[in-house]
């Protein structure tokens, strides 16, 4: 099944957090917090301003995004746990700065 979000909504798949700390301590499942990073799976066309003009979304499919702990609505689509949230719930897009520096 394919899901197409409406308006300014995005569908995000959480990216699991590390299971070990920097010091090598393994974090049990009960102590883990929900990850606040995810990969964008689908985006809506965007919202509309007061005059009805379409305002496109700045986020693209495949972007790695950072969002708040309580952002979005949890849904299950085709057996996958996903989040549907508004574009305004996304704090920013993560980029791989280190790989760009190595390429230069």
Curated annotation (Swiss-Prot):
Annotated GO biological process: chaperone cofactor-dependent protein refolding
Coarse class of the protein's main subcellular location: cytoplasm
Taxonomy of the source species: Bacteria, Pseudomonadati, Pseudomonadota, Alphaproteobacteria, Hyphomicrobiales
Subunit (UniProt): Heptamer of 7 subunits arranged in a ring. Interacts with the chaperonin GroEL.
Task of the protein: Together with the chaperonin GroEL, plays an essential role in assisting protein folding. The GroEL-GroES system forms a nano-cage that allows encapsulation of the non-native substrate proteins and provides a physical environment optimized to promote and accelerate protein folding. GroES binds to the apical surface of the GroEL ring, thereby capping the opening of the GroEL channel.
Keywords: Chaperone, Cytoplasm
Protein name per UniProt: Co-chaperonin GroES 3
Compartment list: Cytoplasm
A GO CC term assigned to this protein in UniProt: cytoplasm
Organism: Bradyrhizobium diazoefficiens (strain JCM 10833 / BCRC 13528 / IAM 13628 / NBRC 14792 / USDA 110)
GO terms assigned for molecular function: ATP binding; metal ion binding; protein folding chaperone; protein-folding chaperone binding; unfolded protein binding
